[in-house]
């Protein structure tokens, strides 16, 4: 998983978003690079544990 990856929630497979940041400053102290910031297609922006997301597509290098 990297910035720009298209992801979906493991708990709600129809819920898609784009990874905006990995290891954001707000979660870095407690969770290091195990969390990311996701911009969901419904307009919400949340912090998620990477293991709770499934990568659908990664951006080309």
What are these regions (language model features)?
Residues 2-59:
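Basic/aromatic-rich interaction segments and small domains that mediate binding to polyanionic partners
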């Amino acid at each position: 998983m990297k910035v720009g990856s298209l992801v979906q929630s493991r708990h709600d497979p129809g819920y898609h978003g784009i990874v905006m940041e990995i290891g954001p400053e707000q979660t870095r102290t407690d969770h290091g690079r195990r969390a990311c910031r996701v911009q969901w297609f419904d307009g919400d922006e949340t912090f998620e544990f990477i293991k709770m997301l499934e990568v659908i597509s990664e951006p080309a290098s």
